[in-house]
């Protein structure tokens, strides 16, 4: 029992100093172009004792060619001994603000959402908003690479055993999307700033829905 209390205390202290929490801590993995439909499977090292997470992301166009809905779902295994796995869930909207042209070479996506993490009586709510900025470079054949940055500001709130606290945090994702097949890509990103984390993912776009 004492070991479990110590493990819970370690999680709370790590998450509340000062509220270094996302809908757990992982890169958004949002490239600089929205998708009509995309399924993204990610493995993340969440850093700062938060452990390893498995995340599924579903991105879906909303009929408007500039709008996209995103759903995140997954779980994390904290590093603290005897700590329970934590459920991760979130949703958001993305808007294609600009597309690259000869005059303005960057694709820009505005993205915001709401994320929830719960487990071991600790609940974290995160409301992020930012912009993914990048450029797609076609290479040989179907191969292309899109480096991107994604600065975002978030309001985070953590609750434990009737107590709660909140803070505003700034993070910047630096990443790249590597397309190696018409419907397949490998995506890697690191989140830097108030929270540090890295993630590697496989993204699949169903045939006929590739942008």
Language-model regions, residue ranges each:
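Short coil/turn segments at secondary-structure boundaries
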Residues: 14, 80-81, 121
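Bacterial N-terminal signal peptides
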Residues: 8-16
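Mid-chain, structured segments of secreted extracytoplasmic proteins
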Residues: 66-105
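Surface-exposed strand-loop-strand hairpins of Gram-negative outer-membrane beta-barrel proteins
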Residues: 43-55, 75-79
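Non-membrane alpha-helical segments in proteins
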Residues: 55-57, 72-76, 110-113
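Bacterial Sec-dependent signal peptides at the C-terminal "C-region" and cleavage site
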Residues: 16-22
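Outer-membrane beta-barrel transmembrane domain signature
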Residues: 22-40, 47-50, 61-64, 97, ...
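Bacterial N-terminal signal peptides that target proteins for export
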Residues: 1-9
